[in-house]
Swiss-Prot record:
Species annotation: Rhodococcus jostii (strain RHA1)
Ranges that cross the membrane: none
InterPro entries (UniProt xref): Rossmann-like_a/b/a_fold, TilS/TtcA_N, tRNA_Ile_lys_synt, tRNA_Ile_lys_synt_N, tRNA_Ile_lys_synt_subst-bd
Protein name: tRNA(Ile)-lysidine synthase
Gene name, Swiss-Prot/TrEMBL: tilS
UniProt keywords, alphabetically: ATP-binding, Cytoplasm, Ligase, Nucleotide-binding, tRNA processing
């Protein structure tokens, strides 16, 4: 399909072209297509810019008629010039709420179907701003407000500098009517309320430009965080001895570096749901040691939880019987 040279679709195409040149020069990509405006504009641009595009349409099967919506999206992808389009039905189950369960099921399906291709996602600057706000609400340190990166293998996000309104304009220029997912308007979901209530209020009170400022903040923190991560990798190589942390060696590092080392070490040991409070308590075992007891962290078994103990100047992760708590 030959795309019209209209302002919005050209901007989306330029964003996709830059991403392909930087991350997929062979031009072999997959696109996650929901049928909504963001992914539809992305798919149209990708089909015009890439050598070969495989459209992947996830059917979450959460609403009546979802199979028809998925089939229509796949047909549109083929009409736009995608080499192939595949519908991926999934079962949405698991803990953490419907939003999280659907996301996990979607990413598993996309990863399984992509082969060796990177998968382009339709996240926009507005999505980035919402992600940074969600991270701020958790208060889990700088990493939680990094936002999303343009390429986190295998996930590509070419539209992080493009506003959501522009993808809608691009669809209008193409004569395409995007699918409107009812879940995207439901106040039951935190991200929807951020989009429809919080961000518009911030834009109004602060005089505009909030979404862009949030996205830039996330990008700056991500760049600085990459430097700290490199420093932490070096510190970890020195401080981890036989799977344990040498507290004297780790104490030589600055607090942000120490916490990165501890986070990496704990996750490798099997910690789950690691929060800032737990991480700082473990850091206290290194830098503010006063003989305090063990620190409980997430993970373990049904009968025993993971704990961190300090013994003879080293930290180790062990199990503690939950039934004694």
């Amino acid at each position: 399909m030959v795309l019209p040279e209209e302002p919005a679709i050209l901007e989306v195409r330029h964003a996709v072209r830059r991403w392909i040149a930087a991350h997929a020069p062979d031009g072999e990509i997959a696109v996650a297509l929901s049928g909504g405006a963001d992914s539809l504009a992305l798919t149209a641009a990708a089909a015009a810019e890439a050598r070969s595009v495989c459209a992947l349409v996830v059917d979450h099967r959460l609403q009546p008629g979802s199979a028809d919506v998925a089939d229509e999206a796949a047909a549109r992808a083929r009409a736009l010039g995608c080499a192939s389009a595949e519908v991926l039905p999934v079962d949405v189950t698991g803990s953490g709420g419907l939003e999280a369960a659907a996301r996990q099921a979607r990413y598993r399906a996309l990863d399984s179907a992509r082969g060796t291709r990177p998968v382009l996602l339709g996240h926009t600057l507005d999505d980035q701003a919402e992600t940074v706000l969600l991270g701020l609400s958790r208060g889990s340190g700088g990493r939680s407000i990094w936002g999303m990166s343009a390429y986190d293998t295998p996930w590509g996000r070419p539209l992080l500098d493009v506003r959501r309104a522009l993808t809608r304009q691009a669809c209008a220029e193409l004569g395409l009517s995007p699918h409107e997912d009812p879940h995207n308007a439901s106040p039951d979901f935190v991200r929807v309320r951020l989009r429809t209530e919080v961000l518009p209020l911030l834009e109004d009170v602060l005089g505009g430009g909030v979404a862009g400022a949030l996205a830039r903040t996330g990008e700056h923190l991500r760049e600085e965080g990459a430097v700290l991560d490199a420093m932490a990798a070096d510190a970890q190589a020195k401080a981890v001895v036989e799977g344990e942390i040498d507290t004297a060696l780790l104490a030589l590092s600055a607090p942000p570096v120490r916490r990165r080392v501890l986070r990496s070490w704990l996750l490798a040991a099997g910690a789950r749901g690691l929060g800032d409070t737990q991480l700082r308590a473990v850091d206290d075992l290194v830098a503010r040691w006063r003989g305090q007891g063990q620190v409980a962290i997430g993970g373990g078994t049904p009968d025993a939880r993971f704990v961190v103990r300090r013994r003879r100047g080293r930290l180790n992760v062990g199990l503690d019987d939950r039934r004694r708590v």
